[in-house]
Amino acid sequence: MRIGQYQLKNCLIAAPMAGVTDRPFRSLCYDMGAGMTVSEMLSSNPQVWQTDKSRLRMVHSDELGIRSVQIAGSDPVDMAAAAKINADSGAQIIDINMGCPAKKVNKKLAGSALLRHPDLVAEILSAVVNAVDVPVTLKIRTGWSPDERNCVEIAKLAERCGIQALTIHGRTRECLFKGEAEYDSIRTVKQNVSIPIIANGDITDPLKARAVLDYTGADALMIGRAAQGRPWIFREIQHYLDTGELLPPLPIAEVQQIMQKHVRELHDFYGQGKGTRIARKHVSWYLKEHAPDDQFRRSFNAIEDASEQLEALEAYFENFLRK
């Protein structure tokens, strides 16, 4: 699949997830087989551009793979400026968020709230496309509510504005993450536009990935929550798409190696204090199926020191492997 001048190594993309897809996680997903990763959402509000939080979220020119940054906002001028700043800082693709269902985002008429205002959508898309020399992509939901599904209208509008790929999450804003994603809307969009379509929502395993590609005709898949604590899902899916065979479960020793490397990189990237706090949620996701009683996770979450976190993980796996 191509986005503008960029050829992805495969059709699997790691979704932008606030508080999750930081640089260490993006690098890990890329190493584990993702064809591209997208940064967590960056606000277009100029008042926050120079904060430590925003600087950590930006991509840098030394990152591996195609560097895509997602921006969010409702002011066309601010969005264009944010796109230019990120492109100048190393972003090779700018992704526009019109799919986030969070209330705090929607209250500012950003994220999926924009789907109710096609005229403003067109202004924002045109402003961003005209502001940068890199490809611009868009991520949306199928609409505001089941009674207001307008993804086909938005897709056609996006194509006219110069958007070079469109990701669609198979739920409306009203649905949040409840129930199951539906793919009929994605299939219909694919039949009505010529730009690449990326299907998103509930793609949890290789069989589901194959089924969604076949049913929707999508050019690529975007995988989000299923990669939390299981970044090797990209490798599993790609192997199945290539061979029709499922890989065996990842050996626990390899899970340990991946997790400990990830935790070390979080410590290095954020520093000991913030790094240890952020590591807690990732370790919880990794160990979901291995520590169902939560006992280890509770004790791990009380650890404040980075080296103690790594020692605790080492001891946990030693005990686990002895069982």
From Swiss-Prot:
InterPro entries xref list: Aldolase_TIM, DUS-like_FMN-bd, DUS_fam, DusB, DusB-like, tRNA-dHydroUridine_Synthase_C, tRNA_hU_synthase_CS
Keyword list, A-Z: Flavoprotein, FMN, NADP, Oxidoreductase, RNA-binding, tRNA processing, tRNA-binding
GO function term, MF aspect, one: tRNA dihydrouridine synthase activity
Keyword check for tRNA processing: yes
Uppermost EC category: oxidoreductase
Active site per the UniProt annotation: C100 (proton donor)
PROSITE patterns for this protein: UPF0034 (PS01136)
Binding sites annotated in the UniProt record for FMN: P16, M17, A18, Q70, K139, N200, G201, D202, G224, R225
EC number in record: 1.3.1.-
Entry cofactors: FMN
SUPFAM superfamilies: FMN-linked oxidoreductases
Reactions mediated catalytically: a 5,6-dihydrouridine in tRNA + NAD(+) = a uridine in tRNA + NADH + H(+); a 5,6-dihydrouridine in tRNA + NADP(+) = a uridine in tRNA + NADPH + H(+)
Transmembrane segment boundaries: none
Gene3D superfamilies: Aldolase class I, Putative flavin oxidoreducatase, domain 2
Pfam family for this entry, one: Dus
Highest taxon of source: Bacteria
NCBIfam families reported in the protein's UniProt record: nifR3_yhdG
UniProt similarity note: Belongs to the Dus family. DusB subfamily.
Chain's role: Catalyzes the synthesis of 5,6-dihydrouridine (D), a modified base found in the D-loop of most tRNAs, via the reduction of the C5-C6 double bond in target uridines.
Protein name, as recorded: tRNA-dihydrouridine synthase B
Gene that produces this protein: dusB
